[in-house]
């Protein structure tokens, strides 16, 4: 299986990489949060742009991205607008969503974008090609904050992302029971062993699913999300605790 290298970080080998989400509402908070995050132990910085109030002002968005890039130049920067339908803060049109991601790609300030699988097949394929032409990696994602589908459906979605040439397919699901967590882990393992030719990221959310955020190296998830301050999704634990557990499991 091939790995994905962003800056000096190799994703898809060794312990799962830690992603943290920065969710600032304006440029002043982007600056202050970035300074606080700089001291934390993580691997990838995700900027959750859907929390940013001045979204319609592309210059403002890119000015904020520039602050993040300059404050943490060594960290891979993942640009993510999470749509309202997949658990994000704002709803925008598909056209605006694609335009926003293209502006981020054009800027040269971001290393990766998050692209939601169910944006529309043609738009997704075109945006992946556009990103790759500009040397930007694509995390293709799907989130369900209500339920966990059957393992076959989880695998089908991850395989579809792979067929659309995502660098890293990602799925996050809400368990209604502990057995839903096992479904997610079993699907992850089957995907990793039988179909994946690149790193994948999977997680089961909330307290019930916390084990999935820790056991990625065992079952085949290449990265996990931790919290520096406020969690960006239910079930995230602090980056320091997360690094400790991931290291213990890696060295066992």
Swiss-Prot record:
Catalysis performed (reactions): 3-dehydroquinate = 3-dehydroshikimate + H2O
RNA-binding listed as a keyword: no
Residues holding 3-dehydroquinate: 21, 46-48, 82, 213, 232, 236
Active-site residues from the entry: 143, 170
EC assignment: 4.2.1.10
Pathway involvement of the protein, from the record: Metabolic intermediate biosynthesis; chorismate biosynthesis; chorismate from D-erythrose 4-phosphate and phosphoenolpyruvate: step 3/7
Any one Gene Ontology molecular-function term assigned to this protein's record: 3-dehydroquinate dehydratase activity
GO process annotations (BP): 3,4-dihydroxybenzoate biosynthetic process; amino acid biosynthetic process; aromatic amino acid family biosynthetic process; chorismate biosynthetic process
Pfam families: DHquinase_I
Broad enzyme group: lyase
Keywords carried by this UniProt record: Amino-acid biosynthesis, Aromatic amino acid biosynthesis, Lyase, Schiff base
Membership in a protein family: Belongs to the type-I 3-dehydroquinase family.
UniProt subunit comment: Homodimer.
Function, in words: Involved in the third step of the chorismate pathway, which leads to the biosynthesis of aromatic amino acids. Catalyzes the cis-dehydration of 3-dehydroquinate (DHQ) and introduces the first double bond of the aromatic ring to yield 3-dehydroshikimate.
Record HAMAP family: AroD
Record's protein name: 3-dehydroquinate dehydratase
Protein source organism: Escherichia coli O7:K1 (strain IAI39 / ExPEC)
């Amino acid at each position: 299986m091939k790995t994905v290298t962003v800056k000096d970080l190799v994703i898809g080998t060794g312990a799962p990489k830690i992603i943290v989400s920065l969710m600032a509402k304006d440029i002043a908070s982007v600056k202050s949060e970035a300074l606080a995050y700089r001291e934390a132990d993580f691997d990838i910085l995700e900027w959750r742009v859907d929390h940013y109030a001045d979204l319609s002002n592309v210059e403002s968005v890119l000015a904020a991205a520039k602050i993040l890039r300059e404050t943490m130049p060594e960290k891979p920067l993942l640009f993510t607008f999470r749509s309202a339908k997949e658990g994000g803060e704002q709803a925008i049109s598909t056209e605006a969503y694609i335009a926003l991601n293209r502006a981020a790609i054009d800027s040269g300030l971001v290393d990766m974008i998050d692209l939601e699988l169910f944006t529309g097949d043609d738009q997704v394929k075109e945006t992946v090609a556009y990103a790759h032409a500009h040397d930007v990696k694509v995390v293709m994602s799907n989130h369900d904050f209500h339920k966990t589908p059957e393992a076959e459906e989880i695998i089908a979605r991850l395989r579809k992302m792979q067929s659309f040439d995502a660098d890293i397919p990602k799925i996050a699901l809400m368990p209604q029971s502990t057995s839903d967590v096992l479904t997610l882990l079993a699907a992850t393992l089957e995907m990793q062993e039988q179909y994946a030719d690149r790193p994948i990221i999977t997680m089961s959310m909330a307290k019930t699913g916390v084990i999935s955020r820790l056991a990625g190296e065992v079952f085949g998830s290449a990265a996990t999300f931790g919290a520096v301050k406020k969690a960006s999704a239910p079930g995230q634990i602090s980056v320091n605790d997360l690094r400790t557990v991931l290291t213990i499991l890696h060295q066992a």
